[in-house]
């Protein structure tokens, strides 16, 4: 019983959904059963079918009729902020936990090394009081947020940060139609999470799509203004330790330069290489998003499993 995998569905068969599927198939706690899309010719759906998943191009309503029979407990939504709200409502009404990879930000923000554990312990407490509370949805912010907010949090846990600004540069080829439609949501959601989770008093986010050929690797720049003169040693140690934590689930996450100190400004320059699961290694923006979501899903699955074994032992 204890080793049983938790069945999951992937909503969205684009770059992010497909990369996530490939990673989830290697998971020891998650079992990908369904992939849902809206374009029957999408490469993601074809791959999912070839890999033995059940697929539909008729959108989420088709999946909803199979939730109970296939015992789907967690769904990962990699569609678009515009449709996430409706998807979330339908999934939660069936008792499915939702991990949101769009910038819709309905549920609380989740940046694994910063706040995943505290979110899940809150979730457990809430679940006991009132199942289906907001704990049923966790939002993974954005690829730029996953890459940079750990760094801002690493600085702000040492001393107060008045302002945090991030610039995420991604290869145009790695940005599918969903990402492109969500640019405004990307900047808003990331800036908000820089404040809420990163701990900066004010946050700003910029995304740049670089059309260069061959495609460039994901680059992220973080600038923070500290309230007082920065404590060089403490900030450097905190940032390096945070980078190691992120590397545990995103091996291609690297410090290119920094922390660089100039007056009250602290700058950190990062590069994120992907594992090359779906798109080549330049698409580190897919990996940081899907790896963070996978890590969150696996922790959630462990919680669901231990809750199930507790229930079983009460029978």
UniProtKB/Swiss-Prot annotation:
Keyword Oxidoreductase: yes
Taxonomy, superkingdom: Bacteria
Active-site residues from the entry: 143 (acyl-thioester intermediate)
InterPro entries per UniProt: Acetaldehyde_dehydrogenase, Acetylaldehyde_DH_C, NAD(P)-bd_dom_sf, Semialdehyde_DH_NAD-bd
Residues the record lists as binding NAD(+): 13-16, 174-182, 285
GO molecular function, one term: acetaldehyde dehydrogenase (acetylating) activity
GO biological process, one term: catabolic process
Reaction(s) the record says it catalyses: acetaldehyde + NAD(+) + CoA = acetyl-CoA + NADH + H(+)
EC numbers: 1.2.1.10
Membrane-spanning segments: none
Keywords: Aromatic hydrocarbons catabolism, NAD, Oxidoreductase
HAMAP family: Ac_ald_DH_ac
Family assignment from sequence similarity: Belongs to the acetaldehyde dehydrogenase family.
Name of this chain's protein: Acetaldehyde dehydrogenase
High-level lineage: Bacteria, Pseudomonadati, Pseudomonadota, Gammaproteobacteria, Alteromonadales
């Amino acid at each position: 019983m204890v080793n049983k995998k938790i069945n999951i569905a992937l909503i969205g068969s684009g770059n992010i959904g497909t990369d996530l599927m490939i990673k989830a198939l290697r998971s020891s706690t998650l079992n990908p059963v369904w992939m849902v899309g809206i374009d029957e010719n999408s490469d993601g759906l074809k791959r999912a079918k070839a890999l033995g998943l059940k697929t539909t191009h008729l959108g989420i309503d088709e999946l909803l009729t199979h939730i109970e029979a296939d015992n789907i407990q967690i769904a990962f939504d990699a569609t678009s902020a515009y449709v996430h709200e409706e998807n979330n409502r339908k999934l939660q009404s069936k008792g499915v936990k939702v991990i949101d990879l769009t910038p819709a930000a309905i549920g609380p923000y989740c940046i694994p090394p910063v706040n995943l554990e505290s979110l899940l312990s809150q979730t457990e407490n809430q679940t006991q009081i009132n199942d289906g509370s907001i704990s049923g949805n966790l939002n993974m912010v954005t690829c730029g947020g996953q890459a940079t907010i750990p760094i801002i949090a690493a600085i702000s846990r040492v001393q107060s940060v008045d302002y945090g600004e991030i610039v995420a540069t991604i290869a145009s080829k790695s940005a599918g139609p969903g990402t492109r439609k969500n640019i405004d949501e990307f900047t808003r959601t990331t800036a908000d999470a820089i404040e809420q989770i990163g701990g900066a008093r004010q946050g700003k986010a910029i995304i740049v799509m670089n059309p260069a050929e061959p495609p460039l690797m994901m680059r992220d720049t973080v600038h923070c203004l500290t309230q007082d003169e920065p404590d060089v040693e403490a900030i450097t140690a905190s940032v390096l330790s945070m980078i190691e934590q992120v590397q545990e689930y995103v091996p291609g996450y690297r410090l290119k330069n920094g922390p660089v100190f100039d007056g009250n400004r602290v700058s950190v320059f990062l590069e994120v290489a992907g594992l090359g699961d779906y798109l080549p290694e330049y698409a580190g923006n897919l990996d940081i998003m899907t790896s963070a979501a996978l890590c969150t899903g696996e922790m959630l699955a462990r919680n669901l499993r231990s809750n199930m074994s507790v229930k079983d032992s009460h029978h």
